[in-house]
């Protein structure tokens, strides 16, 4: 075993206390507060940048769409490089995405920023949740999740209040809060969170995850269009191609020896009931 893998395996044996739980609570709260801050700022953004209707709807939802489309891929990446590294990547992406939004001169740049931030949000929330067993130690996982959830709610409220106050000054100022928090967390995370063991031998299921991501994005776009554009060609094109891509994902995962998602889980009534 290499010294790097030995260190990674030994790290979780350390004891991590309340500070570590506090950190993952703050990490998850950045993801939780971000969409709310965006929604509060959106009327001012739309007026300033001159868009409405479909553009406004897409600007509000595209961050969540990119989060949903990449969350499984993020889990697969964490298996390869470790959860803490995924969290650090998420911090960089969410900070960068919000900064792009803060300086955006047009709807296109704004959407780019929201996509980048959405991927970062997915990495942070998934990473924070995945850290719970690593920092639980002698405590029960349920107890740590209880503390984490409480801190998540508290800091979501705090960040939302501060973000809304900054938006009252300028909507661009509202998007500076999350990058500042992310920058602080970049300094704190390496000192307070353990690195998790990595499965470096597994191959990355790029084809399967790509079809899943594209399929989820198209279906979610179709759902967002359903309320106002049920009869439009765009709605049906997104829906049909999205369903085809999800079906292709299922076929790929069933045949792949390195499947990112065990498709056989859907044979379990308990799993299906939990998902629904």
PLM regions: where:
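Extracytoplasmic
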Residues: 16-56, 60-61, 71
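The feature captures the transmembrane alpha-helix scaffold of multi-pass secondary transporters
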Residues: 18-25, 37, 107-115, 275
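Hydrophobic residues within the alpha-helical transmembrane core of Major Facilitator Superfamily
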Residues: 29, 65, 99-100, 115, ...
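Residue-level signature of mid-helix packing/kink "hotspots" within the transmembrane helices
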Residues: 36, 67-72, 156-157
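Transmembrane alpha-helical segments of major facilitator superfamily
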Residues: 59-67, 152
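Helix-loop-helix hairpins in multi-pass membrane proteins, especially solute transporters
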Residues: 75-206
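Hydrophobic transmembrane-helix bundles of small-molecule transporters
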Residues: 164-276
């Amino acid at each position: 075993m290499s010294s790097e893998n030995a260190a990674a395996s030994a790290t979780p044996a350390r004891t991590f206390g309340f500070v570590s739980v506090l950190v993952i609570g703050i990490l998850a709260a950045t993801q939780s507060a971000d969409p709310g801050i965006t929604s509060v700022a959106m009327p001012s953004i739309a007026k300033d940048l001159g868009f409405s209707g479909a553009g406004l709807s897409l600007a509000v939802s595209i961050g969540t769409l990119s989060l949903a489309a990449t969350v499984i891929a993020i889990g697969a990446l964490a298996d390869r490089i470790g959860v803490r590294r995924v969290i650090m990547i998420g911090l960089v992406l969410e900070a960068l995405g919000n900064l792009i939004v803060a300086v955006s001169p047009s709807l296109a740049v704004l959407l780019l920023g929201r996509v980048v931030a959405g991927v970062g949000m997915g990495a942070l929330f998934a990473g924070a949740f995945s850290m719970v067993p690593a920092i639980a130690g002698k405590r029960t996982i349920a107890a740590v999740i209880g503390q984490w959830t409480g801190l998540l709610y508290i800091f979501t409220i705090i960040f939302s209040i501060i973000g809304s106050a900054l938006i009252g000054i300028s909507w661009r100022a509202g998007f500076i809060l999350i990058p500042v928090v992310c920058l602080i967390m970049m300094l704190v995370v390496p000192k307070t969170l353990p690195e998790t063991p990595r499965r470096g031998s597994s191959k990355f299921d790029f084809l399967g995850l790509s079809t899943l991501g594209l399929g989820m994005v198209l279906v979610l776009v179709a759902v967002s269009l359903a309320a106002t554009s049920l009869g439009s060609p765009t709605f049906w094109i997104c829906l049909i191609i999205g369903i085809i891509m999800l079906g292709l994902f299922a076929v790929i995962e069933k045949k792949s020896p390195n499947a990112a998602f065990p498709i056989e889980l859907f044979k379990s009534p308990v799993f299906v009931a939990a998902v629904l």
